[in-house]
Amino acid sequence: MANLHPTAWVAPGAYLRGDVTLGEQTNVWYNAVLRADQEKITIGAFSNVQDNCVLHGCTVEDKCLIGMNSVILDHAVIGEGSIVGAGAVVAAGTIVPPRSLVVGIPAKVKKTLTDEDVAGSVANADSYLGLMTIGQADPENQG
């Protein structure tokens, strides 16, 4: 039973199962899998879950970017404004502080994001919002 904000977008081929909540202007890209069949998944506003990610019962706060091919396991929390680097695996129960860059297997905090980093991430998110709008308007992208 997905609970999607009216401005959220899920790409064709992405799969949401169970108790998933997507916030305002959040987008989930191609072939991502959000498995909330055992634990709830909450993705905050203005967040971006990129292609081929796998999320289990976790919380992703507002304005986060979850890089391509990342995995986030049960009970992990990704703090507001954080970036999970492409291919990272966030272990079960990991608490990522706000404004963190996490990378690796298992994912570790690489650095705290500066205001400049956050501004760049917000600009990147804005570009994805544009792509999301194109995807919504293009009948070829509707599954």
Predicted regions and their residues:
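Phosphate/pyrophosphate-binding betaalpha-module
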Residues: 40
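C-terminal segments of enzyme domains that contribute to small-molecule binding surfaces
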Residues: 3, 54, 60, 71, ...
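Left-handed beta-helix
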Residues: 6, 11-12, 17-18, 23-24, ...
